[in-house]
Amino acid sequence: MPKDVTVESFELDHTIVKAPYVRLISEEVGPKGDIITNFDIRLIQPNENSIDTGGLHTIEHLLAKLIRQRIDGLIDCSPFGCRTGFHMIMWGKQDPTEIAKVIKSSLEAIANEITWEDVPGTTIESCGNYKDHSLHSAKEWAKLILEQGISDQAFERHTV
């Protein structure tokens, strides 16, 4: 008999969140005492829009690099299937406000500084879908998201 489980993201009421935001989902302690922190990095308001796959894919590759340049402890930052944001998993306890500042800074770099040569993992050898990238789209989405401001709270706007 399969055990009964609750998947937190399917319990979240997507109609009341106010994107863009960073939301602490959970802090979990492993069997050896290690702590991991799980964040909902929601860039687009759910069920109102979504980022095209080329733009999202390029944002994903850039965040993998840019976040690590700004803060230690990143395990993974992977896009949601709904294409409205990312799950970000980190070692240790992490502050949502600090993470929101890191995301804001990373998006500012994407919008204003990044060139195609800066995008990691865009060759057939380094990416499983290397043809599905769009720096133009990534930049346009980053600008739109930044215009709205990044909040460190999901249910009311508190921009960083």
Curated annotation (Swiss-Prot):
- Tell me what reaction this enzyme catalyses: S-(5-deoxy-D-ribos-5-yl)-L-homocysteine = (S)-4,5-dihydroxypentane-2,3-dione + L-homocysteine
Question: For Fe cation, which residues are the binding ones?
Answer: H57, H61, C127
- List this protein's GO terms for biological process: quorum sensing
The answer to whether keyword Nucleotidyltransferase applies is no
Q: Does the keyword Cell wall biogenesis/degradation apply?
A: no
Name the UniProt key words of this record, in alphabetical order.
Autoinducer synthesis, Iron, Lyase, Metal-binding, Quorum sensing
Which coenzymes or cofactors are required?
Fe cation
How and how many cofactors are bound, per the record note?
Answer: Binds 1 Fe cation per subunit.
Highest rank taxon of the organism: Bacteria
* Molecular-function annotations in GO: iron ion binding; S-ribosylhomocysteine lyase activity
**Tell me, what does this protein do in biology?**
Involved in the synthesis of autoinducer 2 (AI-2) which is secreted by bacteria and is used to communicate both the cell density and the metabolic potential of the environment. The regulation of gene expression in response to changes in cell density is called quorum sensing. Catalyzes the transformation of S-ribosylhomocysteine (RHC) to homocysteine (HC) and 4,5-dihydroxy-2,3-pentadione (DPD).
Q: How does it assemble?
A: Homodimer.
Similarity section: Belongs to the LuxS family.
Name of the protein in question:
S-ribosylhomocysteine lyase
Species for this entry:
Streptococcus thermophilus (strain ATCC BAA-250 / LMG 18311)
